Amino acid sequence: MAKKILLVDDAAFMRKMIKDTLSKNGYTELFEAVDGADAVEKFGEIGPDLVIMDITMPNMDGLEALKAIRAKDSGANVVMCSAMGQESMVMDAVRSGAKDYIVKPFK
């Protein structure tokens, strides 16, 4: 069975770049959300195996969305992906339930 991955970023070019990279590596069940509120809604609908989510977004930021997702599913696999690489931000994300943290830009 294919793994379902939810990509969450308000920047369409970033979602496309990650989606293209994952597609080239055999992932086919890829879904997109444009902000944290959209991510929480789609998480409930899709039940993804993995969420890759930005932090700085309109309507609901990634940390708020992470907490809402973890409230729905305490075992949710959420990886934060942000340009904010300060140690304090990484620690906030991990304390909020992120499984990992990727700093942008990346190759």
Language-model-detected regions and their locations in the chain:
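Two-component/phosphorelay signaling modules centered on CheY-like receiver
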Residues: A12-F31
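Acidic catalytic/metal-coordinating carboxylates
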Residues: D35-D38, D61-E64
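Active-site beta3 strand of CheY-like receiver
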Residues: I46-I52
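Receiver (REC) domain active-site loop signature in two-component systems and cognate sites
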Residues: M57
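Short, conserved "switch-loop" micro-motifs in signal-transduction and mechanochemical regulators
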Residues: M84-G85
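A Lys-centered signature of the CheY-like receiver
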Residues: K104
